[in-house]
Amino acid sequence: MSVIQLVFRLLCVLDLLLAVSASGLHGRNRTLSHEYCVLGAGPAGLQMGYFLSRSQRDYIILERNAGPGSFFNIYPRHRKLISINKIYTGRRNKEFNLRHDWNSLLSDRPDLLFQRISRKLYPSADDFPHYLSLFEKELGLKVKYGTDVGRIKASDFNGHQGYVLTDQNGVNYQCRVLLVSTGLWVPQEVDFRGSDLVEGYESIPTDPEEFKDQAVLILGKGNSAFETAQSILGRASRIHLYSPSPVRLAWQTHYVGDLRAVNNELLDTYQLKSLDGLVEGRLEDIAIVRRAKDRGKRRAAKKRNSTSTKRNEPLYLTLTELLDDQNDTNISNVTGQNLPGYHTDNFSLRQPYDRVIRCLGFRFNFSIFDGSARPPQSSGARGRLPGVTAWYEGRGTPNMFVLGIAAHSRDYRMSAGGFIHGFRYTVRAVHKILEQRYHNIAWPTTNIPISQLQSWILRRVNEASGTYQMFGVLGDIILLQGSHCEYLEEFPLQALPQLSALSGRSISDHGLLVLVMQYGLNHTDTLGPGRAESEWTKAWKSNFLHPVLYYYKTLPTDKDMRQRPVGWPLPRPEAVHHMVEDFLTEWDQPISHSQPLRRFLEHCLKTDLRAFYAESCFLLSLTSRNPPLFCRQGYLRKQGIMGNRHLWQHAREAGLMEDAALSEDASVPEYLNHAGAAVISTVNFDL
């Protein structure tokens, strides 16, 4: 090889190295621009990605881990989901079945349901990331994995406030709209003396043998606390749960975030006096300490696998006010006089513990937001969540929307917004708001003749899954327009004063109706006698989930919303109608459900909404200058079901029509053949 060739090759290598170096430096400072940035590829992020993809918007989903739903790779620690996967409902209606499918995301693919992955009623947590991966790949969503966003700041985006997200490689992502779907993953902690001796739910061993013959104190009384207790129930010598509030049972409160029956076995051993128990007290007032005389000692009956001597030293719960020096950080020099048992000899938690475990849930990660983009902490949920508006936009952070469990502050302890079967619908609602605000595409509506409104409402209360799961939070809005109405599905109720701006739909002088699913306000024994109301004349006393209709002549204002009665989802209306609760959740009976609903609608609309057979419409059209609305909007427009031998035979056998209605040759009268016979139900409303 000549010297010239050698020099030439060296120059080529040097040029290549310089190019790679320049590319790397350039990559650290490059900026990628998108209309929408979705932060987090969990269920809420992928759900929004689906809607953005279907609308053909410019978006990117940024995920710090290597796959979707990474939270479920770790939690729940004992790998059993408590979200219902009820496959068999006796129905084939896909919308109805979503009422009892708490794990699937929404899509136009009927085969893309969670039951494709698992058939268990309470599935394994390992199945959920698998389902999310399937959802992402089969729908072709745009997800960029391995992108750990460490800083978010506000910036100008074409004259409007946008956001810049910076990842671990220094790459900037500039977006017009930021959609935060990071979930809750930062462990909730309480600062008290000795908190460093406490183990966290996120790091405890999951092998029950690790707790063999140990006394365990668990801080918290939520599902994670009871899940942990249940896993060691057959191994630990005693388990005590300690928190400020008494345990709340989901089957009493109707809130799925409260203690579920699938996790409550410890209540048996507590109430049947088998060494386990629940105690209430403020966590901020306690201290976890070691007694000086116990230092270096090991109890023979409490040997543990750990080689740490300190871990084997007994731990005591005491009150900060009993310590000699409340500012002393040394929690190992405590004497018997510093323990509650010295002052109250029957103090519930006077015996020592081998382990203290923190199971206090999780909080939102505020640390990645700088001052220009940081949403405020919520007033509820102990500030664990970001504060958002009624349409899920961050307070003080325009064009930043919060999705999923992080937006649960809007319905905390009230509805299912913190869970997949709830926030899949709020994500869809947010997408409709985005379409109106940024693309001038109004909220989808269905134009319905007033004569068909009752039937449409009955269909929704018997099938709709969004209003059923997000009861009291999402509702159907019916904009009355005279002879017809516009029907908006699943609108955020607390945003009702902003309906026109958020939906792009105007309110007429005829007013509006709002359809809501809600529980009763009376707190009754949910398993006791008289727990349910079956008399339709007392429907307003219903305790369990049931439909409620609100009628307003004008759109409620922000002031009306703030001053609404306690426990009401909406302000006081002009008129209200409760459909009596139903054991089967089927509101389709003529006397208890249909007729009272029709009477209420007639009262609000000042219109006769009775349904008539085609023969009656024919006679009324000949004898009246103003036939009923049902006839004008149906029969006189040649609408309805064409009569045939089968329909007429059914009507005769059901006693709806006289035998004379069928001629000897069973042919349909000529005028009915021409117009069509409307067959609406098994009840003749021609009365």
Swiss-Prot record:
Cofactor annotation: FAD
Pfam families the record matches: Pyr_redox_3
Major place of residence: endoplasmic reticulum
Flavoprotein listed as a keyword: yes
Keyword Kinase among UniProt keywords: no
Signal peptide as annotated in the record: 1-22
The record's account of how the chain is modified after translation: N-glycosylated.
InterPro entries: Auxin_biosynth/cation_transpt, FAD/NAD-bd_sf
Organism superkingdom: Eukaryota
Protein's cellular compartments: Endoplasmic reticulum lumen
GO biological process: ERAD pathway
Glycosylated sites: N29, N305
One Gene Ontology molecular-function label: flavin adenine dinucleotide binding
Keywords: Endoplasmic reticulum, FAD, Flavoprotein, Glycoprotein, Oxidoreductase, Signal
Role summary: Probable flavoprotein which may function in endoplasmic reticulum associated degradation (ERAD). May bind non-native proteins in the endoplasmic reticulum and target them to the ubiquitination machinery for subsequent degradation.
Family: Belongs to the FOXRED2 family.
PANTHER family: FAD-DEPENDENT OXIDOREDUCTASE DOMAIN-CONTAINING PROTEIN 2 (PTHR43539:SF23), FLAVIN-BINDING MONOOXYGENASE-LIKE PROTEIN (AFU_ORTHOLOGUE AFUA_4G09220) (PTHR43539)
Protein name: FAD-dependent oxidoreductase domain-containing protein 2
Organism this protein belongs to: Danio rerio (Zebrafish)
Gene for this chain: foxred2
